[in-house]
UniProtKB/Swiss-Prot annotation:
Transmembrane regions: 36-60, 65-86, 104-127, 149-171, 185-205, 224-244, 263-283
Protein family according to the UniProt entry: Belongs to the G-protein coupled receptor 1 family.
The organism's place on the tree of life at top rank: Eukaryota
Name of the featured protein: Proto-oncogene Mas
Organism expressing this protein natively: Rattus norvegicus
Glycosylation site positions: N5, N16, N21
GO cellular component: cell surface; plasma membrane
Keywords: Cell membrane, G-protein coupled receptor, Glycoprotein, Membrane, Proto-oncogene, Receptor, Transducer, Transmembrane, Transmembrane helix
Tissue and organ distribution: Expressed in platelets.
Regions of this protein lying in the Extracellular compartment: 1-35, 87-103, 172-184, 245-262
GO BP annotations listed: adenylate cyclase-activating G protein-coupled receptor signaling pathway; angiotensin-mediated vasodilation involved in regulation of systemic arterial blood pressure; cellular response to peptide hormone stimulus; G protein-coupled receptor signaling pathway; hippocampus development; male gonad development; phospholipase C-activating angiotensin-activated signaling pathway; positive regulation of canonical NF-kappaB signal transduction
Subunit field text: Interacts with AGTR1. Interacts with FLNA (via filamin repeat 21); increases PKA-mediated phosphorylation of FLNA.
Length: 324
């Protein structure tokens, strides 16, 4: 396998190792401060999402929205774990053996898998909430009871397919011209899927959601849920979306965009780590902030007053959604 087809971390590792081996007796180049910041933020985000996942799975009753949040938390955990290990690996500067190379590639591909899944899940959340506002009767009375779990399973499968294509055609391909053309085709496909399908769906549904909520006072009682959705999407578009742009450009223009790659990874780390903070601050009461239990805060943040009726009984919400 040609070394030039490594993922970004692997390529940086190879370049870094070769330069150090060529300059014996000199001091090692300093580790970019970006990696130190990533190594500081990612463990915090990993723990936050782990606590959130535990509450969602074992301490809280589920509704359609929390099923999506559960899967989003799993995607964030996988992303943060991989980027933390990759940053440590870069800092320790191990020799790039064949086995080590495959470990780096596996972590990098898993990182992309978590990133792609996060984009797809956020789009699904935005679209479903938009439908619940546009068609409230359908949402409350006719929505399939396992729709959230089914959609999440489909999106995980789509993310797996897209990530596998990116790995096979762009990361693990050779220098041959047909391999490069295949990679360009995959880049175009991912760009269309990300920027002409999912991102526009997210933006349009979010815009409709905001307009409808501003016009209807009946939505005020569940405004925290909508605030959670909107803030999460805005943070994703600001911090995480640039990474996908740079990753696609990276395959063709490493010399131009390679230096910006670490910054994009830092932004993606911030995005995945910020989600639990968003849920906490939106769900907490201003007068009782830091004095309420986390379960109460999360329940308030994820409360869905438009929850389908078949999920309610005797005035209490009954969990029927399952996490795949």
């Amino acid at each position: 396998m040609d070394q030039s087809n490594m993922t970004s971390f692997a390529e940086e590792k190879a370049m870094n190792t070769s330069s150090r081996n060529a300059s014996l007796g000199t001091s090692h180049p300093p580790i970019p401060i970006v990696h130190w910041v990533i190594m500081s933020i990612s463990p915090l985000g990993f723990v936050e999402n782990g606590i959130l996942l535990w509450f969602l799975c074992f301490r809280m009753r589920r509704n359609p929205f929390t099923v999506y949040i559960t899967h989003l938390s799993i995607a964030d955990i996988s992303l943060l774990f991989c980027i933390f290990i990759l940053s440590i690996d870069y800092a320790l500067d191990y020799e790039l053996s064949s086995g080590h190379y495959y470990t780096i590639v596996t972590l990098s591909v898993t990182f992309l898998f978590g990133y792609n899944t996060g984009l797809y899940l956020l789009t699904a959340i935005s679209v479903e909430r938009c439908l619940s506002v546009l068609y409230p009767i359908w949402y409350r009375c006719h929505r399939p009871k396992h729709q959230s779990a089914f959609v999440c399973a489909l999106l995980w499968a789509l993310s797996c397919l897209v990530t596998t294509m990116e790995y096979v055609m762009c990361i693990d391909s050779g220098e041959e011209s047909h391999s490069q053309s295949d990679c360009r085709a995959v880049i175009i496909f991912i760009a269309i899927l990300s920027f002409l399908v999912f991102t526009p769906l997210m933006l349009v549904s979010s815009t409709i959601l905001v307009v409808k909520i501003r016009k209807n006072t009946w939505a005020s009682h569940s405004s925290k849920l909508y605030i959670v959705i909107m803030v999460t999407i805005i943070i994703f578009l600001i911090f995480a979306m640039p990474m996908r742009v740079l990753y696609l450009l990276y395959y063709e223009y490493w010399s131009t965009f390679g230096n910006l790659h670490n910054i994009s990874l830092l932004f993606s780390t911030i995005n995945s780590s910020a989600n639990p903070f968003i849920y906490f601050f939106v769900g907490s009461s201003k007068k009782k902030r830091f004095r309420e239990s986390l379960k109460v805060v999360l329940t308030r943040a994820f409360k869905d007053e438009m929850q389908p009726r078949r999920q309610e009984g005797n005035g209490n919400t009954v969990s029927i959604e399952t996490v795949v």
